[in-house]
């Protein structure tokens, strides 16, 4: 079908259930927006919001989106539909006053038929009410409104329905690949039609094969057609070499093109088993995975393609080769980016089934909605080579019951029926699955470990209550819990019907499961970040262990305070305003890598050079709160003014056998690495701190920190040219760097950002997890020496001029070119 971007020229206003009367009385404030648009990020945060820390104290609400458009006379009699990739939470879609649909899954794409309700050659009004007023619902920051793109689809008398072209790799090797291509062809004609289907497959713009089929369609008939091809010397898709092809299928009547469908795909084979793990094209791949939520940091939930691409690129550069879409179906832009960068995907169905975790979550609708959600999910994912696993649920409350086991079986079977080329799993949490057995299990745990304190914090329910309790279940006690016979009994029902056994925070079971299920692969679907050394050792030593997914790869909004270091006696999971982010990602909210990211990279075997990190010296002698999701409150910095002569705790992370630390050229000793870490106590003296790694007595890498001198503000944009499409975005990092390139992470600065020209200032903010600053205002204070501005292109060509003022005095400017949009 012909696709038209339908994101421009919308208006949005706040609703309260009486929108028509408010509009009549003039009591509303209407804003013109270009989708995607997250309304929640523009709300004022309050300590008393119903969502509490779960959304970072952002409230929900009702939002009314409207768009006027003209339907050409040429559309009359043709199939016309609208595709909404994501509207949170409940969406009511009206066209010219007619209710077209009510969608209850805020993370699932949905399509509505528009043709019968259009006024051809006249003005039409499309209205979407996005209702996120029933709170709390999801256990994290959700966003509100039409936060993903909208497309208009127009067919012809014979057309190819959306997502019905499927390309399957049957065999692949160095010399050839065998492909099956199937497509659904639909007639909207009242007479018999004779058409030709022309298939072209291209690699980097060059056709590698073409084919044609003739087809007869009777009035209203739908037919499935099949092609089979042998591709010579294919460029296979893999995480290391993510080669992509494009399939173009045209519907021709003579020389006239009635329709076309362009599909990006990769040629690759996939298998998962207990003997070899995950194999892509016959080669074993261990999954170094990152769990991620769907927000884009200071942008909120708005799914800008450039934001999704940036996030995946940064995760890949940090050493991850896989992501888990937690805990809902991934958006199309995210999957496109994963295809391009070679990042494998575990796509996830839902955080709940039929038992609620929050009063107004998806459990209210799951039973009547899950099948169509799976159908849409598979249709969306099928041609993405990055997608290898479907996860049917996360920490499901009823997983340990007979009814839960039966639901698990139904879900897995449905995925297999719709897509037999991929594999199923379920992210099982022992505390949730134990059910009625939990009291007896915990009794045994407490008798084994009698001196352990009870859970603290946990105000507000949802994530806070669960996470607070889970924080006790780590280390030796967690392993005892994980391997308890009653827990084995509870998990067995769901494990039996999944292709891959998925375990959340049950490291003690990673080896045990192979004894219990010798023919099943096992995956750490969610694990504690600081346990990476132990976790990856298990992955490397056991073929049945296919990988590990850390929680989390990228910091995110909501579940606020999970990883914040409290030095004032505060407890994590206690809904402490103004905490806003979880603060537990390997990458912070702006995408900067934190020290644990470099430790992980060394553990993965991807980094030879050592890395240095220093505990924050302003916290010397203080004791902080601690949860298993927290690593260390450290920075890669040797700039600590005012702390001269005080002792700094310095970590060296390295895959070398030994490291030697030098301060201003003087050796502080050589030490053997223990679990990829060596720790030194160093009197802080400005200058140069250098770590040198040795393996077999030979130097195999070094890393140096220097004290920043007279750091000046710098502006660095990730791109200097945008398309004038209303959606392209540039991410501008604002830092303070000296003449030698050393960043000052210590000194704080107050920034004001101004924009003129062919774009808008979409967001300004820092990675500070606890701040009352808004992201939709032009002012921010730096955190760890950094702040970021997101610039979004307008719809006209020109230039964007960005001016940043620091501390009401120093200014820097940056120019970004906005070119006429392609197409």
Predicted regions and their residues:
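Substrate-binding clefts and catalytic carboxylate motifs of secreted carbohydrate-active enzymes
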Residues: 4-5, 11-20, 390, 413-416, ...
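Active-site-adjacent substrate/metal-binding segments within catalytic domains
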Residues: 41-71, 75-83, 88-104, 157-166, ...
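Short, hydrophobic beta-strand segments
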Residues: 114-116, 227-236, 679-684, 778-795
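Short flexible loop/turn segments that cap and initiate beta-strands
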Residues: 193-198, 239-246, 647-649, 655-657, ...
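Beta-strand-rich binding/interaction modules
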Residues: 95, 176-216, 225, 648-666, ...
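Accessory beta-strand-rich segments of carbohydrate-active enzymes
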Residues: 2-19, 36-43, 54-161, 189, ...
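Edge beta-strands of extracellular beta-sandwich domains
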Residues: 260-265, 697-709, 811-819
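Extended acidic/polar, glycine-enriched regions
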Residues: 119-121, 182-273, 683-686
């Amino acid at each position: 079908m012909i696709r038209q971007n339908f994101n421009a020229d919308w208006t949005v206003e706040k609703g309260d259930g009486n929108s028509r009367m408010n509009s009549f009385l003039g009591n509303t404030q209407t804003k013109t927006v270009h989708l995607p648009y997250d309304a929640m990020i523009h709300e004022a945060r309050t300590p008393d919001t119903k969502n509490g820390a779960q959304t970072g104290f952002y409230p929900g609400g009702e939002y009314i989106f409207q768009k006027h458009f003209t339907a050409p006379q040429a559309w009359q009699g043709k199939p016309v539909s609208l595709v909404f990739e994501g509207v949170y939470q409940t969406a009511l879609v009206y066209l010219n006053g007619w209710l077209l649909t009510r969608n209850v899954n805020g993370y699932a794409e949905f399509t509505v038929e528009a043709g019968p309700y259009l006024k051809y050659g006249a003005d039409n009004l499309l209205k979407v009410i996005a209702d996120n007023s029933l709170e709390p619902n999801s256990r994290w920051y959700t966003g509100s409104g039409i936060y993903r793109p909208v497309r208009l689809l127009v067919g012809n008398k014979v057309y190819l329905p959306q997502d019905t072209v499927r390309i399957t790799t049957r065999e692949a090797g160095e010399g050839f690949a065998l492909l099956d291509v199937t497509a659904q062809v639909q007639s909207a004609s009242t007479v018999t039609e004779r058409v030709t289907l022309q298939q072209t497959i291209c690699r980097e713009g060059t056709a590698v094969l073409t084919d044609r089929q003739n087809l007869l369609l009777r009035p209203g008939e739908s037919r499935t057609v099949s092609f089979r091809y042998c591709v010579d010397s294919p460029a296979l898709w893999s995480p290391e070499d993510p080669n992509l092809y494009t399939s173009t299928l045209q519907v021709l009547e003579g020389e006239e093109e009635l329709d076309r469908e362009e599909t990006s795909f990769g040629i690759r084979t996939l298998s998962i088993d207990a003997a070899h793990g995950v194999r892509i094209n016959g080669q074993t791949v261990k999954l170094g995975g990152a769990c991620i939520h769907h927000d884009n940091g200071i942008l909120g939930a708005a799914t800008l393609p450039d934001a999704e691409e940036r996030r995946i690129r940064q995760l890949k550069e940090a050493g991850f080769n896989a992501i888990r879409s937690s805990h809902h179906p991934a958006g199309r832009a995210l999957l496109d980016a994963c295809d391009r960068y070679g990042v494998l995907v575990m796509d996830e169905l839902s955080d709940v089934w039929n038992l609620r975790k929050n009063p107004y979550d998806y459990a209210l609708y799951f039973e009547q909605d899950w099948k169509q959600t799976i159908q849409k999910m598979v249709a969306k994912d099928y041609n993405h080579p990055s997608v290898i696993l479907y996860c049917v649920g996360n920490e499901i409350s009823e997983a340990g019951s007979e009814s839960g086991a039966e639901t698990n079986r139904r879900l897995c079977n449905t995925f297999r029926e719709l897509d037999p080329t991929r594999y199923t799993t379920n992210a099982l949490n022992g505390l949730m699955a134990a059910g009625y057995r939990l009291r007896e299990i915990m009794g045994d745990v407490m008798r084994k470990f009698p001196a352990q304190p009870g859970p603290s914090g946990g105000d507000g329910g949802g994530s806070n209550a669960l996470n607070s309790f889970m924080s006790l279940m780590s280390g030796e006690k967690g392993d005892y819990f994980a391997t308890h016979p009653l827990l084995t009994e509870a998990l067995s029902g769901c494990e039996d019907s999944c292709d891959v056994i998925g375990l959340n925070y049950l490291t003690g079971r990673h080896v045990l499961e192979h004894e219990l299920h010798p023919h099943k692969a096992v995956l750490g679907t969610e694990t504690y970040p600081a346990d990476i050394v132990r976790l990856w050792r298990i992955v490397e030593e056991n073929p049945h262990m296919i990988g590990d997914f850390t929680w989390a790869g990228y910091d995110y909004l909501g579940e606020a305070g999970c990883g914040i270091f409290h030095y004032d006696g505060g407890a994590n999971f206690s809904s402490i305003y103004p905490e806003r982010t979880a603060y537990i990602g390997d990458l912070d909210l702006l995408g900067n890598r934190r020290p644990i990211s470099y430790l992980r990279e060394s553990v993965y075997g991807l980094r030879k050079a050592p890395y240095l990190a220093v505990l924050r010296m302003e916290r010397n002698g203080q004791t902080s709160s601690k949860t298993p999701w927290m690593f260390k409150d450290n920075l890669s910095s040797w700039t600590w003014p005012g702390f001269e002569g005080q002792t700094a705790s310095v970590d060296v992370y390295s895959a070398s056998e030994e490291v030697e630390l030098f301060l201003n050229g003087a050796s502080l000793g050589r030490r053997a690495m223990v679990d990829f870490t060596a720790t030194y106590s160093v009197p802080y003296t400005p200058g140069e701190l250098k770590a040198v790694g040795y393996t077999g007595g030979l130097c195999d890498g070094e890393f140096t920190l220097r004290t920043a001198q007279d750091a000046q503000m710098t502006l660095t944009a990730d791109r200097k040219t945008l398309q004038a499409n209303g959606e392209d975005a540039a991410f501008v990092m604002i830092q303070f760097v000296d003449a030698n390139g050393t960043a000052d992470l210590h000194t704080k600065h107050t920034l004001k950002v101004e924009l003129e020209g062919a774009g808008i200032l979409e967001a300004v903010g820092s990675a500070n997890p606890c701040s009352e600053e808004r992201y939709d205002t032009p002012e921010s204070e730096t955190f760890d020496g950094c702040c970021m501005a997101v610039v979004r292109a307008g719809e006209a060509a020109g230039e964007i001029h960005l001016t940043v003022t620091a501390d009401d005095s120093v200014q820097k400017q940056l120019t970004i070119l906005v070119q006429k949009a392609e197409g």
